[in-house]
């Protein structure tokens, strides 16, 4: 989408908070342990290039993305540190990754054989990380025989440099550690089958790095914590490691573009799901579901000036309406999502309201909303 620079609505990102979150995690790394900053999905909606530059300054060893194009975006922005694509990239694009020094995930043996053909044609070597499905049920090796066969294939194979081996935990943030332990056991078993020697072995995501300090991993893949958000939906989990302070970086702001009084019996928005029972002051905000502010947020309270006001009527594609307690001037500031975790319209509260997780709310805020960066 085209960013709406001439519309009073934007996502604001405090790079100072991002910096402090990264620094706090760096302090908790084990001696010799390194950090990969996860900046996939436009850095969870915060802006991949800007976040990556801060992470480079702080000392991140490299970056994780989800698709090859995200890695290429970083390279085009002169990011030179290692980049790992966590998702599956078609083998035919392996040469593009190799030329741009981007590491790819190997999901299975068949992928290796196909990628080798494309790399051999151009006499290229690709850096790879062996993905292990230890219980996520997503991508990666999960059978011993196939993994052993892949290892033999990689021995003395000039088309590949085995840079890493990794898995992803499904429940590192859960109070019940049984499945976490099952996954760790499975990963360690697969690691014992290695005949090639990766530079990096990594299993720790944000949740594992915060809640499971006993995990031995060359790298920590630090993701949601960069943005100051708790990796767990369990509020008590924030106390599992009180030394790590997470400071939310994102706020979502707009302003009133229209204010009017409607009368008893008047409806608001499509379907007239809100009908005034008395004279009511309505304010219009130029943000809608086309920006990622979905219709389920009807009823959620946003901050208009210094008052919390409910969204009334259905959220439109490009606008939504709020019920105001008093006449307010056009141009009054509207904080849709606050970066203050104590405010009732913080991102966790927004996620709870629509029965999802804050990861999704942040990622929903799309490119039509300009990102404004500041350091505080």
From Swiss-Prot:
Q: Which GO terms describe its biological process?
A: D-alanine biosynthetic process; peptidoglycan biosynthetic process
Cellular component aspect of the GO annotation: cytosol
InterPro entries referenced in this protein's UniProt entry, alphabetically: Ala_racemase (IPR000821), Ala_racemase/Decarboxylase_C (IPR009006), Ala_racemase_C (IPR011079), Ala_racemase_N (IPR001608), Ala_racemase_pyridoxalP-BS (IPR020622), PLP-binding_barrel (IPR029066)
Report the EC code(s) recorded for this entry: 5.1.1.1
Residue positions annotated to bind substrate are 138, 317
Q: Positions modified as N6-(pyridoxal phosphate)lysine?
A: 40
Query: What catalytic reaction does the record list?
Result: L-alanine = D-alanine
Name the domain of life.
Bacteria
- Gene Ontology molecular functions: alanine racemase activity; pyridoxal phosphate binding
Q: What are the UniProt keywords, alphabetically?
A: Isomerase, Pyridoxal phosphate
Annotated active site: 40, 270
This protein's pathway: Amino-acid biosynthesis; D-alanine biosynthesis; D-alanine from L-alanine: step 1/1
Top-level enzyme category: isomerase
Cofactor names from the entry are: pyridoxal 5'-phosphate
What the record says about family reads:
Belongs to the alanine racemase family.
Which NCBIfam families does the protein's record reference?
alr
The free-text function statement in the UniProt record for this protein reads: Catalyzes the interconversion of L-alanine and D-alanine. May also act on other amino acids.
Query: Which HAMAP family does this entry report, sorted A to Z?
Result: Ala_racemase
The protein's name is Alanine racemase
Source organism: Lactobacillus acidophilus (strain ATCC 700396 / NCK56 / N2 / NCFM)
| The encoding gene | alr
């Amino acid at each position: 989408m085209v960013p709406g620079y001439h519309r009073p609505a934007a996502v604001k990102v405090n790079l100072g908070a991002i910096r402090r979150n990264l620094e706090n995690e760096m302090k908790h790394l084990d001696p010799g342990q390194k950090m990969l900053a996860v900046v996939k999905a436009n850095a969870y909606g915060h802006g991949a290039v800007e976040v990556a530059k801060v992470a480079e300054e702080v000392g991140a060893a490299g970056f994780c993305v989800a698709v090859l194009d995200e890695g290429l975006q970083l390279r085009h922005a002169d990011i030179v540190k290692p980049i790992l694509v966590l998702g599956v990239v078609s083998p035919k694009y392996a040469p593009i990754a190799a030329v741009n020094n981007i590491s790819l995930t190997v999901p299975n043996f068949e992928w290796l054989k196909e990628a080798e053909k494309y790399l051999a044609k151009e006499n290229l070597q690709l850096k790879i990380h062996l993905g292990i499905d230890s219980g996520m049920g997503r991508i990666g090796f999960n059978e011993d025989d196939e993994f052993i066969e892949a290892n033999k294939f990689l021995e003395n194979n000039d088309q590949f440099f085995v840079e890493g081996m990794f898995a992803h935990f499904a429940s590192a943030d859960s109070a019940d550690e049984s499945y976490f332990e099952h996954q760790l056991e499975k990963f360690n078993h697969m690691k014992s089958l290695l005949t090639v020697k990766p530079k990096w072995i990594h299993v720790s995501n944000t949740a594992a790095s915060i809640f499971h300090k006993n995990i031995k991993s060359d790298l920590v893949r630090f993701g949601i914590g960069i943005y100051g958000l708790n990796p767990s939906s369990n509020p008590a989990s924030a106390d599992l490691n009180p030394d790590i302070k997470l400071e939310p970086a994102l706020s979502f702001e707009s302003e009133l573009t229209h204010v009017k009084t409607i009368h008893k019996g008047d409806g608001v928005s499509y379907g007239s799901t809100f009908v005034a029972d008395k004279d009511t002051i309505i304010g219009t905000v130029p943000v809608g579901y086309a920006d990622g502010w979905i219709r389920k947020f009807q009823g959620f309270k946003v901050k208009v000036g210094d008052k919390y006001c409910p969204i009334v009527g259905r959220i439109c594609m490009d606008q939504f309406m709020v019920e105001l307690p008093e006449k307010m001037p056009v141009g009054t500031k509207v904080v849709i999502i606050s970066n203050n975790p104590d405010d009732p319209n913080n991102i966790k509260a927004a996620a709870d309201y629509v029965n999802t997780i804050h990861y999704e709310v942040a990622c929903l805020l799309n490119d039509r909303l300009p990102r404004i960066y500041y350091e505080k």
